[in-house]
Structure formats: structure tokens, C-alpha cells
């Protein structure tokens, strides 16, 4: 249950989660603008997955602080960022044999008989 009331604008009712999503989107863009020049994206294998995890974490923290019952506030965010941005990238990198991070795969010639 959120502390924010249901907003009614011109006869349309908007749930509190909509405003939490808009606020978390604004904070996500500000945080992303700060992180881009810092060089943290050089350590991230897949920036789109990292951005998704970052937005989910910001939304989770906003919704926890707006009145939702969250016992372990920061732990799920850290786990989500680690698993999606780093661990999944390493597993995919291992599957492709180390050639998928922007490097060219050496040409493989097959002898057809």
C-alpha cells in the first residue's frame, strides 16, 4: 500500500505507481547521465541489461520509500545489478569463446571433401 493517493485528473484515475514510475524514470536518466562520463560502462558487458537493472533498482527504492513494505531494501537491488549486468555477461562471453565483445572472430576455413 502506497502513501500516495489515487489521483483523478479530468475524470481519469491514475494509480500511485504511475507517479513512482515517472519519478524513477527521471532519477534514472539523471543517474545515467552521471554514470556515462564516469567510465563505469567500460566494465559492463551489456549496457542495455545494465540500464534495465539500474531502472528496476531505482524504481524498487522509490517504491520502498513511498510506503511499500520492504524488509530488505537494498539487497535485491545489488543482487539484480550483479546478476544481470555482470554474471550474465560473463556466461555469454564464455559461450562465444571470448570473441563476442566487439572483437573479430578469426576466419575459420573448412575443408570440404
From Swiss-Prot:
InterPro entries, per the entry: DUF1656
Segments crossing the lipid bilayer: 3-23, 43-63
Recorded superkingdom: Bacteria
Keyword Transmembrane helix carried by entry: yes
Main location: membrane
Annotated membrane topology: Multi-pass membrane protein
Example of a GO cellular component annotation carried by this entry: plasma membrane
Pfam families linked to this entry: DUF1656
Subcellular location: Cell membrane
Entry keyword annotation includes Transport: no
Protein family: Belongs to the AaeX family.
Name of the protein in question: Protein AaeX
Naturally occurring in which organism (per UniProt): Sodalis glossinidius (strain morsitans)
Name of encoding gene: aaeX
Amino acid at each position: 500500500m502506497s502513501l500516495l493517493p489515487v489521483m483523478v485528473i479530468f475524470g481519469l484515475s491514475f494509480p500511485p505507481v504511475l507517479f513512482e514510475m515517472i519519478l524513477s524514470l527521471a532519477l534514472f536518466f539523471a543517474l545515467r547521465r552521471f554514470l556515462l562520463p564516469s567510465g563505469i560502462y567500460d566494465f559492463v558487458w551489456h549496457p542495455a541489461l545494465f540500464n534495465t537493472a539500474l531502472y528496476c533498482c531505482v524504481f524498487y527504492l522509490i517504491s520502498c520509500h513511498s510506503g511499500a513494505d520492504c524488509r530488505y531494501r537494498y539487497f535485491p537491488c545489488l543482487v539484480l545489478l550483479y546478476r544481470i549486468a555482470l554474471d550474465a555477461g560473463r556466461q555469454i562471453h564464455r559461450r562465444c569463446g571470448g570473441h563476442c565483445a566487439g572483437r573479430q572472430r578469426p576466419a575459420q576455413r573448412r575443408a570440404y571433401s
